[in-house]
Curated annotation (Swiss-Prot):
It is found in: Cytoplasm. GO terms for biological process: unsaturated fatty acid biosynthetic process. Homodimer. Belongs to the thioester dehydratase family. FabA subfamily. Necessary for the introduction of cis unsaturation into fatty acids. Catalyzes the dehydration of (3R)-3-hydroxydecanoyl-ACP to E-(2)-decenoyl-ACP and then its isomerization to Z-(3)-decenoyl-ACP. Can catalyze the dehydratase reaction for beta-hydroxyacyl-ACPs with saturated chain lengths up to 16:0, being most active on intermediate chain length. Pathway: Lipid metabolism; fatty acid biosynthesis. Coiled coil: none annotated. This is 3-hydroxydecanoyl-[acyl-carrier-protein] dehydratase. Keywords: Cytoplasm, Fatty acid biosynthesis, Fatty acid metabolism, Isomerase, Lipid biosynthesis, Lipid metabolism, Lyase. It catalyses: a (3R)-hydroxyacyl-[ACP] = a (2E)-enoyl-[ACP] + H2O; (3R)-hydroxydecanoyl-[ACP] = (2E)-decenoyl-[ACP] + H2O; (2E)-decenoyl-[ACP] = (3Z)-decenoyl-[ACP].
């Protein structure tokens, strides 16, 4: 397990995807192409709307990103589910970063609103998570609100994003 930082570059995120950041069997990010951000620019255990922690990440948008070629031909747009998954990825990363053990699984959300699209001409996507609750018992559960913006304009808002960290056998059950 590496020393905890307050920001992470792309190579650090890849190390997390390989299971090298938080130790074997613990929270991992997906590897490309499903890793949906290029860097974490801020992560803290305090602050944010609820005083429970903040995580901010960014994705540099390039017209040749894999999803633009297939979603949709002649009308390229990033699938909304990928932006949502990025928010879940960040909550899981936060849980591992704070010492939670187990494998991360998205468990749902309260509400989701889209008011714009991520298109190839966008320069940067910014993601923001405000942690609301962290419960540590047989399972580690994080609940957060988050948003996604393109070039500074918020276009997705999600409430009560839920991610759990499960031990290996329980993670297999959660995925059923």
């Amino acid at each position: 397990m590496r020393e905890r930082q307050n920001s992470y570059e792309y190579e650090d995120l890849l190390a997390c995807g390989r299971g090298e950041l938080f130790g074997p069997g613990n929270a991992q990010l997906p590897l490309p192409p499903m890793l949906m951000f290029d860097r974490i620019v801020e992560i803290t255990e305090t602050g944010g709307e609820f005083g429970k922690g903040v995580i901010r990440a960014e994705l540099d948008v390039k017209p040749d990103l894999w999803f633009f070629g297939c979603h949709f031909k002649g009308d390229p747009v990033m699938p909304g589910c990928l932006g949502l998954d990025a928010l879940w990825q960040m909550v899981g990363f936060f849980l591992g970063w704070t010492g939670g053990s187990g494998r991360g699984r998205a468990l749902g959300l309260g509400d989701l609103k889209f008011s714009g699209q991520v298109l190839p001409h966008v320069m940067r996507v910014q993601y923001h998570i405000d942690m609301k609750r962290i419960m540590r018992s047989r399972l580690v559960l994080g609940v957060a609100d988050g948003w996604l913006s393109t070039d500074g304009e918020i276009i997705y808002r999600a409430t009560d994003l839920k991610v759990g960290l499960f031990q290996q056998d329980a993670a297999a059950q959660a995925g059923k």
